[in-house]
Design a protein with these regions (language model features):
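Positively charged n-region of N-terminal signal peptides that target proteins for export
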Residues: 1-4
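Low-complexity, Ser/Thr/Pro/Gly-rich disordered linker/stalk regions
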Residues: 20-278
Length: 278
């Protein structure tokens, strides 16, 4: 049995991209974001690639999509010596990731629409042993005084009431239960389009409306949408796995690779007829 000797923070996504090497990139399936980076740890393999419909890969719209694959070894530290503090690294055995980071944004009092389409590979396997897989998150920028939360919201594959679901979760709209997007087994091998319409507020005057395949599945009104005192953030898309320590301490080689496809990743302002009425 292997023993995990380093201290791991209980906060899921506290690892900030500044501790990793970030490589500029440009995917044409991402629109509206000013910056794109592959969030890549030092000396790790990039498994995020553009694939073509003409080569037989699943594509939601147009000719290409983004294939994301994560391996159990996709963890580590950035340049320098951040490994002295485990909080600054992805702890091997407890986390692995392949993500695209889309640049910091001011959020407070803004009204934004975030869209993306996700396709779970037919061979995608959900994790066991209490592990969680995040596919899409709005990370907090941690710049404001009192901003200690990792994220404003995220979408994850996790076990819920005995089965694995893709769910939306928020640390901001703190009174809300997870929003069920779909059972993982039902989402494999097909595209699911998601749209998040958000009025970013630090008090309980915000709103968060969620669409799945153009149908409203949740609408949180008069709610806090910014975590803690946080006023900014940045979207990350890809696969981020945490709490995989159960595999490390038992059968590390049984932790499977996972693959999803992403397309039509869009940030935009709402059109005049889409804006929330005051």
């Amino acid at each position: 049995m292997r023993f995990f000797l380093l201290v791991i923070t209980p906060i899921f996504f506290l690892i900030n991209g500044s501790f990793a090497d970030e490589h500029k990139t440009k995917f044409k399936d991402i629109k509206g974001y000013k910056k794109q980076f592959i969030s890549m740890h030092y000396k790790k393999t990039n498994r995020i690639i553009e694939v073509k419909k003409s080569d037989g890969f699943p594509v939601f719209e147009g000719d290409t999509s983004i294939q994301v694959t994560v391996n159990r070894e996709d963890a580590g530290c950035g340049h320098g010596n951040p490994e002295k503090l485990q909080i600054n690294c992805d702890g091997k055995g407890n986390r692995s990731r392949q993500e695209i980071s889309l640049g910091e944004m001011k959020l407070k009092n803004k009204e934004h629409i975030y869209e993306y389409a996700v396709y779970f590979d037919e061979n995608y396997e959900s994790l066991e042993k209490g592990a969680v897989v995040v596919i899409g998150q709005m990370h907090a920028d941690n710049k404001a005084k009192g901003c200690h939360n990792c994220c404003h919201f995220w979408a994850q594959d996790t076990k819920y009431k005995g089965e694995n679901y893709y769910t939306w979760v928020s640390k901001s709209a703190y009174s809300s239960d997870p929003v069920i997007i779909g059972k993982i087994d039902d989402l494999k091998g097909k595209w699911t389009h998601l749209k998040f319409h958000v009025l970013w507020k630090i008090d309980e005057t915000g709103r968060f409306k969620i669409y799945r395949n153009n149908e409203v599945i949740a609408d949180f009104k008069n709610t806090k949408t910014l975590a803690d005192t946080c006023t900014g953030g940045y979207m990350k898309f890809g696969i981020y796995r945490h709490r995989t320590i159960g595999y490390w301490n038992s059968d590390w080689e049984s932790l499977p690779d996972q693959r999803v496809y992403l397309d039509n990743i869009i940030l935009r302002k709402p059109k005049k007829d889409e804006k929330f009425k005051k």
